[in-house]
Amino acid sequence: MKLPLLRPLWPMLSPAAGSPDSPPEPSKPSLPAAWLLLHALFCATSMAVGFRFSRLIVYLLFLPTPINPTAHLVSLVSPPVMLAAANATTTITTTTTTTTTTVTTTTVAAEVGAHPQHHHHGPVFVGRHPIRVRPWPHPDPNELLKAHHILAAVQNAQRSSRRRGAGPPRPVIAVTPTTTSALQVPSLTSMAHTLRLVDGPLTWIVVEPEHHTDAVAAVLSRSNLNFLHITGPDSSTSRLRMHALREIRKRKMDGVVVFADENSILRTELFDEAQKVKSVGAVPVGVLGEDEGTSETFLQAPSCDAEGKLVGYHVSEETMLPANRGDMLLSSRLEWAGFVVNAQALWEGGGAASRPEWVSDIDAIDDGAAASPLSLVTDAARVEPLASCGQAALAWSHRSDALHEVKFPHEWKIDPPLVTIASRQQDAKPETPLKRTTLLNTEGQH
């Protein structure tokens, strides 16, 4: 085919070739352009066909041996076949043989409808492993639902492990001091739904003044949480909170303590950051303030240097107090929702799991200092900044005492009910609209 290379040999191969001393003949004309185009077309065709067959040979040599080689070869070469038989049935028989038993399973597929369906020849491979294609993932819907629950549980565990690390989560102890007010039942109900989203074991400690109330007990019973309902000697929120911390020390409860006050809104990321605390830690918290008729909104957060060490606290929009000024920090109004504590740091009795020297004794904290979360430490600079010392709020606290004086229905229930019982006469005037009008007038006064 390489005719130009043979051109120098033509005079020697020709029968009429003369002696070497004879004069050279005039050069012959070049090959026509049509012949060159035909030659290029044949070369391209041979390359395409060769690549196709070489690819098929590679598949046959290096892929694992399928169950049905003939069907596997057909599936590689040709697309799936459309079967449109009106009354066709398919029977699939699978035989599994082991050293002791032989199990034969026969599955009869449903009749193919009038509409065509796709059928694959041979098994479908995912990587190097064949899988079985079913028209439905599992014939039993109950088993399918269980499989979805298992997948959801595995995915939640993987997301939680990526957030907090590979180790199991420590127990969470949520402390909530509560007093009777219009916000008590709504706030506790909202907090219960938030705590139910926490990964890992959780104990909810709710402290009431003097005695238990039915409204709080009803919220706790509906929460489906592990709770501890106790009472304190005083109605002050700070004293009730300290009473809960003494109860943790008395019972030697292990875990991380999160302060979930009634006026707080917590994010689930707060509980993930609380897992990192060693003794006492601080997180950013947004504050919505209403003090003496003025409204102020700012972010309370720890302030860090370039190395990530605590240097102060942001206590307002434009004020940052240094960490070494404990007197100024104690006098400032810091929110308990922005601090987390390791429960073992409250224990007494010595040992590795005992209170550090820079953590205050709960019994030695007076009532005036109990309102500040920094009363738990003797050195405010030893507090651990969490959340990478970021400026994104992990909780919000609403400072407002106006709703504590608002009148509200007992347990937020309408008594008598709106539905009239059958024993009453139809022409009798219901008393419920009158009570509803009274409630509206009461709300209008405030």
UniProtKB/Swiss-Prot annotation:
Any one Gene Ontology cellular component term annotated for this protein: Golgi membrane
Locations listed in the record: Golgi apparatus membrane
Record-linked SUPFAM superfamilies: Nucleotide-diphospho-sugar transferases (SSF53448)
Residues carrying a glycan: N87
Lumenal side: 52-446
Pfam families registered for this protein in UniProt: Glyco_transf_43
Molecular functions (GO terms): galactosylgalactosylxylosylprotein 3-beta-glucuronosyltransferase activity; xylosyltransferase activity
Domain of life: Eukaryota
Keywords: Cell wall biogenesis/degradation, Glycoprotein, Glycosyltransferase, Golgi apparatus, Membrane, Signal-anchor, Transferase, Transmembrane, Transmembrane helix
Cytoplasmic side: 1-30
Membrane topology: Single-pass type II membrane protein
Primary location recorded for the protein, binned into one broad class: Golgi
Disordered: annotated segments: 425-446
Record-annotated membrane-spanning stretches: 31-51
GO biological process: cell wall organization; glucuronoxylan biosynthetic process; plant-type secondary cell wall biogenesis
Annotated EC: 2.4.-.-
Family affiliation: Belongs to the glycosyltransferase 43 family.
Function: Involved in the synthesis of glucuronoxylan hemicellulose in secondary cell walls.
PANTHER family (UniProt xref): GALACTOSYLGALACTOSYLXYLOSYLPROTEIN 3-BETA-GLUCURONOSYLTRANSFERASE BETA-1,3-GLUCURONYLTRANSFERASE (PTHR10896), GLUCURONOSYLTRANSFERASE OS04G0650300-RELATED (PTHR10896:SF24)
Protein name as annotated: Probable glucuronosyltransferase Os04g0650300
Source organism (scientific name): Oryza sativa subsp. japonica (Rice)
